[in-house]
Amino acid sequence: MIIKFDESNHTVLPAFKGGQKEFSAHMFFDGTNRVFKGILVPGASIGFHKHEGNCEVIFILDGKGCVIEQEPDSEQTSREVSAGDCLYCPDGHSHSLMNTSAEGDLVFYAVVARQ
């Protein structure tokens, strides 16, 4: 299957998962799994949230940002991310993603798959 994001539904979600500003995405949903191309403008974020019954893989395409991750029963960690990085949030783990650059969008592909 080929997913053409430019031809898919465009959604703008303010304060997504409790984050800052807006999360803009072209999303594909097959009733079980989600695949999307996301954009966070400078200062925008996807709020900290836990994955339950699914996992998420994020491929950073462009820009710079910060991911906050937390494994069960552990402290949060913060790491810088940039184009070429791949992030994995397994079932039961928590994370958030933020565009920390002063200018330039953080652009990424993500897959949220049920487990």
Residue ranges and their predicted role:
Residues S82-A83, D91-Q115:
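Ligand-binding loop in jelly-roll beta-barrel domains
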Residues K37, S78-E80, S94:
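Well-ordered beta-strand positions in beta-sheet-rich domains
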Residues G53-C66, Q70-E71:
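Glycine- and acidic-residue-biased ligand/ion/polar-headgroup-sensing regions
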Residues F36-E52:
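Conserved short histidine dyad/triad with adjacent acidic residue
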Residues M1-R34, G47:
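A short, N-terminal "cap"/entry segment at the start of jelly-roll beta-barrel domains
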Residues G31-N33, G53, P72, A102-E103:
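Short strand-connecting beta-turns/loops that link adjacent beta-strands
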Residues S45-G47, C66, D85-L87, D91-L97:
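Histidine-centered metal-chelating micro-motifs
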Residues P72-P90:
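Short acidic-glycine-tyrosine-enriched beta hairpin
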